[in-house]
A protein has these predicted regions:
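Substrate-binding pocket helix/loop in short-chain dehydrogenase/reductase
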Residues: 98-111
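Active-site helix of classical SDR
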Residues: 122, 158
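Conserved glycine-rich cofactor-binding loop
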Residues: 15-16
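SDR active-site lid
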Residues: 164, 170-208
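Conserved glycine-rich Rossmann-like NAD(P)H-binding loop of the short-chain dehydrogenase/reductase
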Residues: 29-45
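Conserved NAD(P)H cofactor-binding loop of Rossmann-fold oxidoreductase domains
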Residues: 90-95
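Residue(s) in the substrate-gating loop at a strand-loop-helix junction
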Residues: 142
């Protein structure tokens, strides 16, 4: 392992999809990694591939950000690990369901992960980055945050929150050498989609 001049990137939702791609690309650019997700087996697999291919130091944290104890553990890492220079807030929960037939507990979990956990991680990372002289925060939003559609009202609202929060903090943090950006992906076929049944219910004949 070679010491990273760029520091360490902590990535949530890193076991598959966009999070795993971020892990791969950041490792190629010289970052060491802390990968966070719910599945330890999947995390271990991603970590091994990256470590073997690029020789970066890769640490994993099994955490469900919808669980307060797990979330607090990740916050503590952000506050206390001086090597961390980037936070990628990628973990999220989605669903495709009319409001009238939705389960309110599922909606609450979506808000907890997409809004509350993301916000708490930003506020764990930002003061630490300022004290260390700089850093980068990437918040995963969605095109649905600016273009709401039916069946995705709560999800789109959570992503609109992410966009608003990011814009609000951009000026404040840029003056302290901390960059923050919101990423607004459109339709991306990932395991996240399979879990929310988006593919079969919204685009049954358009994706292969």
């Amino acid at each position: 392992m070679t010491e990273s001049a760029k520091g360490t990137a902590l990535i949530t939702g890193a076991s598959s999809g966009i999070g795993a791609i971020y892990a791969d690309r950041l490792a190629r650019r010289g970052y060491d990694l802390i990968l966070v997700a719910r599945s330890q087996d999947a995390l271990t697999s991603v970590a091994k591939v990256i470590s073997d291919a690029m020789g970066r130091e890769v640490t994993t944290i099994r955490a469900d950000l919808g669980q307060k104890g797990d979330l607090l553990n990740v916050e503590e890492v952000l506050r206390t690990d001086p090597s961390i220079t980037m936070l990628v807030n990628n973990a999220g929960v989605g669903a495709v369901e009319p409001l009238l037939t939705s389960n309110v507990e599922d909606m609450e979990r979506m808000i907890t992960v997409n809004v509350t956990a993301l916000t708490r991680l930003v506020y764990a990372a930002a003061p630490s980055f300022v004290s260390r002289g700089g850093g980068t925060i990437v918040n995963m939003a969605s095109a649905l945050g600016i273009a709401p559609e039916i069946l995705n009202g709560v999800y789109g609202a959570t992503k609109a929150y992410v966009i608003a929060l990011t814009f609000s903090l951009q000026k404040e943090l840029s003056e302290k050498n901390v960059r923050i950006q919101a990423v607004l992906p459109g339709a991306v076929e990932t395991p996240f989609w399979a879990a929310s049944e988006v593919r079969s219910r919204v685009f049954p004949n358009r994706l292969s």
